[in-house]
Swiss-Prot record:
Region annotation (Disordered) ranges: 175-194
Organism: Shewanella sp. (strain MR-4)
Similarity remark: Belongs to the UPF0502 family.
The protein, known as: UPF0502 protein Shewmr4_1554
Gene3D superfamilies membership: Winged helix-like DNA-binding domain superfamily/Winged helix DNA-binding domain
Stretches with biased composition (Polar residues): 175-193
Highest taxon of source: Bacteria
PANTHER family: UPF0502 PROTEIN YCEH
InterPro entries: DUF480 (IPR007432), WH-like_DNA-bd_sf (IPR036388), WH_DNA-bd_sf (IPR036390)
Length: 222
């Protein structure tokens, strides 16, 4: 399953609204366009026309990832996803897994901590460990749907990406780039961490000492 940026946004919005506003689901083209273009909880922020959203829907329909619904005399066609948890879907996911995949589709790669903070309307994770456990399950499927990205410089947590729109080739390229010598020496940083921490401590002590002397000088002049 390979999704374009626009297709991923449409699927992410349908997954989100199914949980957060079930009374308004399925979504009309207008409602779906508004959801795709939200200024909050979206990365990147898009400005899609209804025509572009319709193009994405037509493509998803050919892939059998959405279905159209109209009824009760209304001429307005509404759309629902067939991305997961349908009778014939290959993807049968827990609500926790749906929440994680939904957030990654809507906001791109994120850390477990970010996923837990942002998932409160989709699923109630009790802690980050539960998020990490769910991520692990999604990565260990016969067909993995998530991948771990190389840790960014200065960050403590790794980010994770979905593999529906973030292709495996892109993930592997990012990993190779991060592991190359020109990308920065993460291993060297790890080896020198103690020395750097000791140096920082020493500098902090020197700054504190200078501050004490400055305070004493100011006091003597006043």
């Amino acid at each position: 399953m390979e999704l374009t940026l626009h297709e991923a946004r449409v699927i992410g919005c349908l997954l989100e609204k199914e949980v957060t506003t079930p009374e308004q689901y399925p979504l009309s083209l207008n409602a779906l366009t508004l959801a795709c273009n939200q200024k909050t909880s979206r990365d990147p922020v898009l400005d899609l026309s209804e025509a572009l959203v319709q193009d994405a829907l037509d493509s998803l329909n050919k892939k059998r990832l959405i279905s159209e619904q109209s009824g009760f005399g209304s001429r307005v066609v509404k759309y629902k996803h067939r991305f997961c948890n349908t009778e014939f879907s290959e993807l049968q996911l827990s609500s926790a897994a749906v929440a994680i995949i939904c957030l990654l589709l809507l906001r791109g790669p994120q850390t477990p901590g970010e996923l837990r903070t942002r998932s409160n309307r989709l699923h109630d994770f009790k802690d980050v460990l539960e998020v990490e456990a769910c991520i692990k399950q999604l990565m260990e499927r016969d067909k993995p749907v998530l991948a771990q990205l190389p840790r960014e410089p200065g960050k403590r947590e790794c980010r994770y990406a979905e593999l529906f729109s973030q292709g495996a080739e892109q993930i592997n390229a990012a990993s190779l780039s991060a592991d190359s010598p020109s990308a920065g020496s993460n291993s060297l940083n790890a080896q020198d961490r103690q020395q750097l921490e000791a140096r920082v401590t020493q500098l902090e002590e020197q700054v504190a000492e200078l501050k004490d002397k400055l305070d004493s000088l100011i006091a003597s002049l006043s």
